[in-house]
């Protein structure tokens, strides 16, 4: 722990946690084993963080929701294992109207300037590219990718393995495996590149593609 960092005596730190200069960890924060805060990281609120997460400079985790209905309720932010939070990433906890929890699962990458609002649920192996932003109550299923400078409207659900192209505005639910692009989202086809990268069996890809054609003509 760097001597310039301020760590609450009420915070819980696991084994081999590394905290660089000018970090702040407030009351009720729990950091599990092998996490690293490089520098200038602020973690606050009722925030529970799993193992081997890495936080880059100026990431701000657990500050109160940007929801005007929030009245200081004791909500939570839960983060799993092996996630990367790059510079200037912001994540807010839940609210009363959303079950009181924002949750991030495992092996996700949140690139520079991305934002996860209150009451979001993020699956595993999700990527938010630079400056992608999620409104409140958004659900992102496993292996989805949200392109840079995209905005996902509140209450939208993004299906597994879907890809959202850069600069997209997403206002409706997105089917699993779908590829969407545009200032307003429009269906362009299947995310075949993503399926192949994840080594999905070719016979399953054919089945998905045939189903897609039948439903969407």
Predicted segment positions?
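Structural signal for interior beta-strand "rungs" in well-ordered beta-sheet cores
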Residues: 1-186
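An accessory alpha-helical subdomain
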Residues: 196-217
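Conserved beta-strand-loop-alpha-helix hinge in the C-terminal portion
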Residues: 180-198
């Amino acid at each position: 722990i760097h001597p310039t960092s301020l760590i609450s005596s009420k915070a819980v730190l696991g084994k081999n946690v590394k905290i660089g200069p000018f970090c702040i960890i407030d009351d009720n924060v729990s950091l599990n084993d092998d996490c690293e805060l490089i520098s200038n990281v602020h973690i606050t609120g009722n925030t529970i963080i799993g193992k081997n997460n890495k936080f880059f400079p100026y990431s701000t985790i657990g500050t109160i929701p940007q929801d005007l209905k929030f009245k200081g309720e004791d909500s939570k932010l839960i983060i799993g294992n092996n996630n990367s939070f790059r510079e200037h990433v912001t994540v807010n906890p839940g609210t009363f109207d959303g079950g009181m929890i924002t949750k991030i699962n495992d092996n996700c990458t949140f690139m520079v300037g991305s934002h996860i609002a209150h009451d979001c649920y993020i699956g595993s192996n999700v990527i938010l590219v630079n400056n992608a932003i999620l409104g409140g109550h958004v659900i992102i299923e496993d292996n989805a990718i949200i392109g840079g400078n995209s905005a996902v409207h509140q209450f939208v659900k993004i299906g597994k393995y879907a890809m959202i192209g850069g600069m997209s505005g997403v206002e409706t639910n997105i089917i699993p495996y779908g590829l969407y692009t545009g200032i307003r989202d429009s269906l362009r086809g299947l995310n075949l590149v993503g399926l192949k990268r994840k080594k999905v069996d070719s016979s399953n890809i054919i089945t998905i593609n045939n189903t897609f054609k039948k439903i969407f003509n």
